[in-house]
Structure formats: C-alpha cells, structure tokens
C-alpha cells in the first residue's frame, strides 16, 4: 500500500480515522473536520521514561482508543511542514496498523477546518504488532545496519549545538547524514525517482537501514521517504541522539 494519500483520495474514504500529529508547546486546536489530535508530547509518548518521545507501553490500546480497528482507514497529517505526521504513521506500523500520510499535510487541505474531537474508543485490533520496526541502543550497536541520521548537517558534524541540554555533539560512528527537510519539496515528498537517487547518493547499495535523529521523531520522516523510494528493511532507533549522545 502506498504510504501517501492525496486530498482527493482522502475525500473518497469512508469513515476514516484522521489523526493530526503535533509536537511542541502550542498544539493546534483545529484541523480537517472529524480529526483527533495525536500529541507526541501527550498520549503518543510515555512521559514516565527518561528519554523524550518514548513509545507508549500500550500502543495497540492507544490506537484502539482512537477508534482504529483492523479494517479502519487511518490517515495522519500535520501542520508542521511534515515533521511529525510520519512519527504517528510509524507508530501505527509498529502497532500493526497500515496508516497513510496525507501528502502536503494540512496545508494541502482546501476545505473547512473544525475543532478536534476526543478519541471515541471502540476500536479492536487483531493484526500482529511489529516491534522490530523500533531498535534500542544495544541492537543498533550489534546488528550492523547502516544508521541514517536525519538531523541537520551541523548537528551531525558537531558544529551546531544540540537543542537538548546534556548531549555531546557529533554522531553515531559509521552513520551517514540525510537531513529530513531534504526529502520534501514545497511541503510534499519528492517523487519516488528523486528519493531513490537521493538515497543511492547517501547509502550506496545498502538496503538495511536504521533511522535516527534527536529523539526518534524526524527519523520517521526519512523512514517514510525510504519507504516511498522502495526500501523495505527499515527500522527507527527509538532513543536516537537523546540516548546515544548523553554526556
């Protein structure tokens, strides 16, 4: 299934679950009518953990609380230039849910906006979860996969400061850099052909890729781009530089 969906395709869906992904201190209050807010600083992370944006313990139950069942169309979007929707899309994959990302995000929507509605509950998921889509630090050290870092070139090189305190500069040894904004063109993901060329230039002939960033959020942007480019053996390093870069 194509992980992207257009506005025209979205309008043709019957009773989709719409999730507006958000991260930061000022979440939006309105979105596509019928949407629910998917707050990466709230329900869609585990604040009891010492790393930011850790996956909630009951991920399947979380999606069920938003009314998601095995046959429910799920569409994720954001109003943050595509930085956050892919994270919710990836979490859905981990939970066994085949969601899609609205190409162009909220900016591509030309209809009216409405206030978000609370999670309705009532979902039932029986599909098998896919926990292997997330990797911990020991797995990243041991599995020999190529790590693709989605942070800026300056943060990767250690010439720009980290936004979170207590982290040293630099990158995971042996990793390569693909800053996540480069996969977008005016808010839309670049074409599969453009993304294929981009990944060939960065990863060569490697197909086993683990994506990292600051806290596992924008790593999912490059994971989405790799999926569109035809890569399949993909994972996200959950702790990312927030864990690896601890001083």
Q: How should these model regions be labeled?
A:
Residues 1-247:
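Cytosolic catalytic domains that perform sulfur/thiol-centered chemistry
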């Amino acid at each position: 299934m194509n992980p992207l969906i257009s506005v025209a395709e979205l309008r043709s869906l019957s009773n989709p679950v719409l999730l507006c992904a958000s991260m930061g201190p000022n979440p939006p209050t309105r979105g596509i009518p019928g949407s629910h807010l998917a707050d990466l600083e709230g329900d869609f992370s585990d604040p009891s953990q010492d790393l930011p944006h850790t996956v909630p313990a009951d991920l399947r139950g979380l999606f069920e609380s938003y009314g998601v069942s095995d046959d429910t169309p799920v569409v994720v979007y954001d109003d943050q230039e595509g930085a956050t929707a892919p994270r919710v899309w990836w979490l859905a994959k981990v939970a066994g849910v085949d969601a899609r990302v609205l190409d162009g995000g909220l900016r591509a929507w030309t209809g009216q906006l409405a206030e978000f509605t609370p999670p309705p509950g009532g979902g039932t998921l029986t599909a098998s979860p896919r926990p292997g889509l997330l990797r911990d630090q020991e797995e990243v050290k041991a599995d020999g996969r190529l790590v693709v870092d989605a942070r800026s070139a300056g943060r990767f090189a250690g010439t720009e400061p980290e936004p979170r305190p207590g982290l040293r500069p630099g990158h995971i040894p042996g990793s390569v850099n693909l800053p996540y904004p480069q996969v977008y063109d005016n808010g839309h993901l670049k074409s599969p052909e453009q993304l294929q060329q981009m990944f060939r230039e960065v990863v060569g002939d490697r197909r086993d890729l683990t994506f990292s960033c600051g806290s596992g959020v924008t790593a999912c942007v490059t994971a989405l781009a790799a999926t569109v480019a035809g890569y399949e053996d993909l994972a996200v390093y959950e702790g990312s530089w927030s864990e690896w870069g601890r001083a």
